[in-house]
Amino acid sequence: MSKWLALSIALVGMGSSAVAQDAPYPPVVTFAVFRNGENVGKHVITFQQKGDSRIVTVDADITVKAMGVKAYHYAHHSNEVWVGDQLQSLQATTEDNGRKFSVSAQRVGANLKVEHTSTGPVASAAYDGFQAPDVSRETLPASTMPTSLWNFRYAKQSTLLNTQYGIPSRVTVVQGSPELVQTAKGKVEATRYTYSGDLRMSLWYDSRGRWVKGTFAAFDGSTVEYVLQE
């Protein structure tokens, strides 16, 4: 999701297609987002079944203030369509402190056809506004998982579709041991997966394959933590 927050991710993974199809989540899952212990936003995932398709919507909104003044704002919205454990399409938009990104992905045969666009503020003596959109295209294997965090199969991948930038993110994932993780409703046992490479973070999944916690290191040295609220 963001360079500043090291959240250019929408990550996740699961152990089997059965888990993905069973979707071990309620219709709405909410995480509170903390930066160095201060609540700075929320991350909400909704699940809806339409026939054979599962629609997954992700909304994140993060605001960091300095001395009461907004210093940083990040907003992300994505819509995924799944049939079983196969991603059929993805639409995502992100605003990262004034810079805007959009990603569109469509399954075509054995591939994902991806188009990504970015625009950003431009300030100069001659012009103050937004630059013309920068449009690029990628073709990835259809098995590539998006970085949307909720899907446990994400933890089994070495290449992910970055849902902010629309490019492949290459990662190495190390599985830890089960541990107790604090949520808003108490502690749950979950396994930690530590990511390095293009994405640097830790994600925790419980025995049912549910995402229950995430931590990310921001470029300024702060720690961003996702705490499950359900």
Residues covered by each model-derived region:
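Bacterial N-terminal signal peptides
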Residues: 6-15
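A structural detector for short beta-strand units
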Residues: 76-78, 101-104, 171, 199-203, ...
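N-terminal mature ectodomain segment of secretory-pathway/periplasmic proteins
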Residues: 25-116, 209, 214-216
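Positively charged n-region of N-terminal signal peptides that target proteins for export
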Residues: 1-4
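Short, exposed beta-strand-loop hairpins at the edges of beta-sheets
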Residues: 195, 202-206, 211-220
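Sec/Tat signal peptide C-region and signal peptidase I cleavage site
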Residues: 16-20
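Solvent-exposed helix/loop surface patches that form functional interfaces
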Residues: 24-26, 91-190
